[in-house]
């Protein structure tokens, strides 16, 4: 579990911490593309523990059941069914897919988009710039900047204690329970 997930979980934890530190840019709905990816899963796990935050996983039809089984998405919606989600509700888009086509569709549909966070590129066949987009300009998440900020805020020990506590909770969730994700 450690070797496979811990490096990705650190990024997940930092994304959650960054968004919370920014008060979720005034939004209460988080939209995560590539919801079945390990980093999206870790991020959703963290976000789902926050009071008043709705976590919606966006994925392909073949990954819906898996994403639902993770237990941290309030809803799982396929990429071709974005219109099932109210676009006017203030939302944050956390883009793990990196798909230019999906990013364009997200920005066009979600008129209440408060922040667009680019994290990854799991859809390698559809990468690139999206040109002019409605709504906020996508901003690449840079994990070292959040580490630096939290190191200054909490010190090395405080940062490590928080991260280890979150990791222990996540690692227990993925390796135990009625349907462990990793055994």
What spans do the regions from the language model cover?
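Terminal helix/beta-alpha structural elements that buttress the NAD(P)+-binding lobe
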Residues: 1-183
């Amino acid at each position: 579990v450690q070797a496979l997930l811990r490096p990705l979980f650190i990024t997940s934890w930092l994304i959650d911490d960054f968004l919370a530190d920014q008060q979720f840019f005034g939004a209460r709905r988080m939209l995560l593309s590539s919801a079945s990816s390990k980093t999206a899963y870790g991020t959703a796990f963290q976000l789902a523990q926050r009071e008043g935050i709705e976590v919606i996983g966006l994925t392909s039809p073949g990954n819906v059941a898996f994403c639902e089984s993770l237990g941290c998405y309030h809803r799982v919606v396929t990429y071709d069914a974005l219109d099932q989600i109210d676009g006017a509700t203030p939302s944050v888009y956390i883009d793990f897919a990196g798909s230019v086509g999906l990013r364009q569709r997200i920005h066009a549909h979600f008129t209440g988009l408060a922040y667009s966070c680019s994290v990854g590129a799991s859809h390698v066949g559809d990468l690139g710039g999206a040109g002019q987009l409605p709504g906020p300009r996508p901003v690449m998440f840079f994990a070292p900047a959040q580490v630096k900020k939290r190191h200054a805020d909490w010190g090395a020990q405080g940062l490590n204690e928080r991260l280890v506590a979150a990791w222990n909770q996540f690692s227990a969730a993925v390796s135990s329970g009625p349907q462990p994700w990793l055994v």
